[in-house]
Amino acid sequence: MITDLGDKKLTTENDDYWIAPDANIIGSVHLSRDASVWFNCTLRGDNEPIVIGEGSNVQDGSIIHTDPGFKCTVGKFVTIGPVSYTHLTLPTTPYV
């Protein structure tokens, strides 16, 4: 489910991304090229923006949430493994 919160909404660079049908994208979330959000994930950009970098994937059951004043940026080609809870910025190519 994609939920806009006023002017906070999902943005993308193009159509080269994938969101599982039961994932929750809330507020200010940006998906870069070839990014993917898998089953039962929740990305809550209600406080600050979340940016998922090129080729990165957020795997099943993971949650990304922001705190006021702290956006979350996931770099290029990052894998956030299943059932992870993330509040932080991740550089390019790590596995969480």
Residue ranges and their predicted role:
Residues 11, 15-19, 23, 29, ...:
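A structural motif detector for beta-strand N-caps
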Residues 2-9:
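N-terminal charged helix/coil linker that caps or initiates catalytic domains
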Residues 87-96:
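Single conserved hydrophobic/aromatic residue that forms the stacking wall/gate
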Residues 61, 67, 96:
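Residues that scaffold the ATP/ADP-binding catalytic core of kinase and kinase-like folds
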Residues 25, 64, 94:
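Glycine-rich nucleotide phosphate-binding loop and flanking beta-alpha elements
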Residues 46-47, 67-69:
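Right-handed parallel beta-helix/beta-solenoid
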